[in-house]
Every structure is written in structure tokens, then in C-alpha cells.
Swiss-Prot record:
Residues 53-284 are periplasmic. It comes from Myxococcus fulvus (strain ATCC BAA-855 / HW-1). It is found in: Cell inner membrane. Its main location: membrane. It is a single-pass type II membrane protein. Essential cell division protein. GO terms for cellular component: cell division site; plasma membrane. This is Cell division protein FtsQ. The chain crosses the membrane at residues 35-52. Belongs to the FtsQ/DivIB family. FtsQ subfamily. Keywords: Cell cycle, Cell division, Cell inner membrane, Cell membrane, Membrane, Transmembrane, Transmembrane helix. GO terms for biological process: cell septum assembly; FtsZ-dependent cytokinesis. It holds the Pfam family POTRA_1. Residues 1-10 have a biased composition (Basic residues).
Length: 284
């Protein structure tokens, strides 16, 4: 009997172990399957991502076919493509847009540049160029934009016919660029007002001369107009009236003084003919 009891006990223990295993499977099985599924899913995503990356970097579909430019006037597409080392067949996904913009921005005529990838196989480049409005003597001859920025040296191929701003030197500009640009902007403002109020091509502006406390203009005919300081718009309107009066009398002026500080309304004129000179006339 003792042997029979021992055998029954072993059977009971085995049955209990099987039941325990079944219970563990019932309780832990779904969780284990979930973990396994997540592991497999993550693996598939990683593999799929790597495969997708490989495809995007090697597929002919994303090879550069065309580059379009807008805003070009002085700069050329050939120059910009060379600066950026941008060539047909490059993969669009590998292009560094910021690096392309920095490279193209080295061109002296460019004020701003924006590069955009147009998938699957194009790139567009939008540029804004400096607008040349004058030239300045700063040791060498530089081109000025409308902000008074000397953005490039004048080269023979520029083909510019612009007023010349003189009276500043390179040392002064380097020592205080902000103050120098402010003076250049004031000269450009006077040049712009002159062009608007004196459309006569015979008296086209040739030079704006910056002096210590004053400003003078020189025209293409060699006439000098001394504006002094301040009230440039009013003085230029007065200049137009003086020229009309001189023209009506058949006279031409060599120098016109509009810089009388004590009597701002007075105009002194040196007539071109040495035989006659008219000065001190009030032209209010």
C-alpha cells in the first residue's frame, strides 16, 4: 500500500505541474506574443527604412536633371553652377541646400540666394542682386548699391555709367564703416533727388563730392553746384529755377553756389564766360 500511495502522489504532482504550465501559458502567452510581434515589427521597420534609404540614394529617379534660376541680371547661371559645384546627375537627397546657398553667395552681385529642391529631380534658385546706383573711390573704384554698400570692385566688364562719389578714403571707411556708409547714403539720396528734379541730359550728374561739412555736385558738362549742408531738396528745386533763368538769358554757369549759410535763399553764380559774372542774386 505504501508503494501505491507513493505512485499516486507522483501522478498528482505531475498533473499539478502540467496544470501550472498550462496556467502560465494562458497568463503569459498573449504578452509574450505581443513582445515577439513588436520585436518583429521593429526589425521589419529598421530593415524597411534601410532599404528605403538605399533606394532613395541610388535610384535614377532622384538624379538631378534641371536647375532653374530666377532674378539673374548681372550674375550668370554658369558662374553660380560653378561656384556651387552643382552638376547633372547628383542625387537630390544628398544635396546640402545651406552649403549650396553659401557657395553661390560668394558671387559679388548677389544680395540674397535661396535654393529649393523640387523632387524628384529639379532644383530652383531664386536670387536678388545688388542694384548699382553709383561708384565710389575708396582706394580703388567700388560699385555702390542703394544702401550705400560698396559690394564689389569695378571691373572692365561691368559696363557701368554711374555717378562717382568722392571725398572718402579706404582708411576712413575701414576705421568707421557705419559712419562712412551713412555719408555714402546721404550722397546717394542727393544724387537720386537730382536725377528726379534735373532730367536734362545735358546736365547729367557726373560726381558727388563729399567735403568736410558740405557737399558739391559736378555735372557731365563740368558745371559745379555747391550745395553746402542740409535742405538738399529745396536747394535742388532752386537750382532748377536758376538754370531756367540762365537758359532764358542765353547764359551758362560754371559754378552755382547754393551754400550761403547766412542767407540760404541767396544764389551766387559764376558765368562760364570770363567777361561777365553774376553773383549775390536772391532766388527765393
Amino acid at each position: 500500500m505504501a508503494f501505491g500511495k507513493s505512485k499516486n502522489r507522483r501522478r498528482q504532482d505531475a498533473a499539478q505541474q502540467k496544470e501550472a504550465v498550462r496556467g502560465a501559458v494562458r497568463s503569459q502567452g498573449p504578452r509574450a506574443l505581443k513582445v515577439l510581434g513588436l520585436t518583429l515589427g521593429t526589425g521589419l521597420l529598421v530593415w524597411g527604412g534601410a532599404a528605403l534609404r538605399e533606394w532613395t540614394l541610388t535610384s535614377p529617379r532622384f538624379e538631378l536633371e534641371a536647375v532653374s534660376f530666377s532674378g539673374l541680371q548681372r550674375a550668370s547661371r554658369v558662374e553660380l553652377l560653378r561656384l556651387a559645384a552643382l552638376t547633372k546627375g547628383q542625387n537630390l537627397w544628398t544635396l546640402d541646400v545651406d552649403a549650396l546657398e553659401r557657395a553661390m553667395d560668394q558671387h559679388p552681385w548677389l544680395r540674397t540666394v535661396e535654393v529649393t529642391r523640387r523632387f524628384p529631380n529639379r532644383v530652383s534658385v531664386e536670387v536678388t542682386e545688388h542694384t548699382p546706383v553709383a561708384m565710389a573711390v575708396l582706394g580703388e573704384l567700388y560699385v555702390l548699391d542703394e544702401e550705400g554698400e560698396p559690394f564689389k570692385r569695378v571691373t572692365p566688364g561691368d559696363g557701368l555709367d554711374l555717378p562717382l562719389v568722392t571725398g572718402l578714403d579706404r582708411e576712413g571707411y575701414v576705421a568707421d564703416p557705419a559712419a562712412a556708409r551713412e555719408r555714402l547714403r546721404s550722397a546717394l539720396a542727393v544724387a537720386s533727388a537730382y536725377a528726379r528734379l534735373s532730367p536734362d541730359q545735358a546736365e547729367q550728374l557726373s560726381e558727388v563730392r563729399l567735403e568736410a561739412q558740405s557737399l558739391a555736385l559736378v555735372t557731365a558738362s563740368g558745371q559745379e553746384v555747391r550745395l553746402g549742408e542740409g535742405d538738399s531738396e529745396v536747394k535742388l528745386q532752386r537750382l532748377a529755377r536758376v538754370r531756367r533763368e540762365l537758359g532764358a538769358r542765353g547764359l551758362a554757369a560754371e559754378i552755382i553756389h547754393l551754400d550761403n549759410r547766412a542767407r540760404p535763399g541767396w544764389v551766387a553764380v559764376k558765368i562760364s564766360s570770363p567777361a561777365s559774372e553774376r553773383s549775390g542774386a536772391s532766388m527765393r
